[in-house]
Amino acid sequence: MRWELAQEQEMFRDSFADWLADHASSEAVRGWLDAGDAGPFDQRMAADGWLGVGFSEEAGGQGGGLLELALAAEQLGYAAAPGASWLASVLAAPALAARPDVSAAVLEQGEAAALAVTAACPPDEPGPVVAKDGALHGTVRGVLGASHARHLVVPVWADGQCTLFLAAAGEPAISRTGRKLLDRSRSAADVTFTGAPARPLDADGRAVLAEAALRAAVLVAADSLGAADRMLRLAVDYSRQRTQFGVPIGSFQAVKHAAATMLVAVESSRTITYFAAASVEQGGGESGLHAAAAKAQVTATAEEAADSALTLHGAIGYTWEHDLQLFYKRAKLNAYLFGTPQVWNERLASALPLLRGR
């Protein structure tokens, strides 16, 4: 099956891709990584109005849904653009529906938000933070986008129930310690609450986190799709330029087969990702299966594409000066971001009717 986008969706994808080509070239990305500060990119993205795409106008957005967000994530992955603040805000924003002032600040003014869950696990897994007398206590390891967030949505689990709290990240009782990641285009930090004041949000915590898990699965898969697509193009271009025995290495059958395998993987991943995004947006009974399949299959496929692309390039592909290393590291991190393929395959298997009946 081949997924066909609507004309408006194609126009959005192409417009965002053109914008990224102008504002997030490989040279610009390296500059931000060298400086350790992607703030200029985040600020420009907010100023040019891209943060509101995928959210309703009532919430302060510009319309669209999860499929539009997936198209944006795909292009961010294709450019290896800094994406931690964007993805963190996208996952936190639905929890802010009861606080339209904060929601508008995030989507319209670019005040970054983050969901205080560990980026190593699906967002709906219980966390360590507890609430006592309206104050938060505990440490959450590796929170995506926390370093630059102004608003933190903090899940507190008790007796199987989840309450979401909103905290200002700049509170003195909240400390953030940055973590080093293989892929420096994303950022994460350990967040410690030592009696931090917070207010509960009027939201169904379990439902919000369950939705966040599905959205995270789809959007990380879309990012991997974009990275894999870019690595395919880099590998094909390099195989046309690099010569061995007096001919381009792209003329060798083994290289052709490797490139063809990557192409099939990219196109199948595209259909899986788009279908999962549409399914989660519509909220069907099998949307969880589709999201799990996308996260498990697409991120694993992108990892394989990264290895193939690096093999075709040789050692030069991992040097700082070559673009391939940006996408290689991105694909590798995506496989672990919000749960490994194994974790999502287990969720997929446990939800199948054959196993549910046992």
Where do the language-model regions lie?
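A generic structural signal for well-ordered coil/turn residues at beta-strand boundaries
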Residues: 111, 124-125, 148-150, 161, ...
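Alpha-helical interface subdomain recognition
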Residues: 1-77, 135, 214-358
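N-terminal glycine-rich flavin-associated loop
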Residues: 83-101
